[in-house]
Amino acid sequence: VIREKELSGIGSVDPRRMSTLIDEIIAHVHPNDFICIEGFPFATQRAMFAGGLHHGIRNELFKRKIQYYEVAPNALKKFVNVTGWVGETGNKRRLKDKEKKKAVMDAVKELYGYQHKSDNVVDAYILAQIAKDLWTIKSGVFSTLNEGYGRKNQFEVLDTVKG
């Protein structure tokens, strides 16, 4: 079951916004959930907020003894076959912020038929797909994934995340 909801916390001033956002996120977590969270985004304009938010979520999961798997931001993109580059070999250029987000959103629509106006929700959808596939593999459930069928880029991400 997939439910989509963009969480934002209360207000626009920290630490209240960050604290209430962490509370909102944790309110949706159940003890036996299989969780994938995005790794730290080191190349962000809002590093202080992102770092605080990421640590806050991890601390809350730790206090509740809830295991999680961390997915690096580039692995999240790789899972939907977005490299962050466009163009032909020898003439490539790096995608910038909004271009990269749009490329990820377009890839998710193409691969899964899923779309949402928020890139945060789309990223969460990808994390849910990674968690589902990782759970399938770890649980030994009969699946094409356990038979070696699937996209190479996705297997590479799953191998990296499961450790």
Feature roles, as predicted:
Residues 1-163:
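Phosphate- and other anionic-substrate recognition elements at nucleic-acid/protein interfaces
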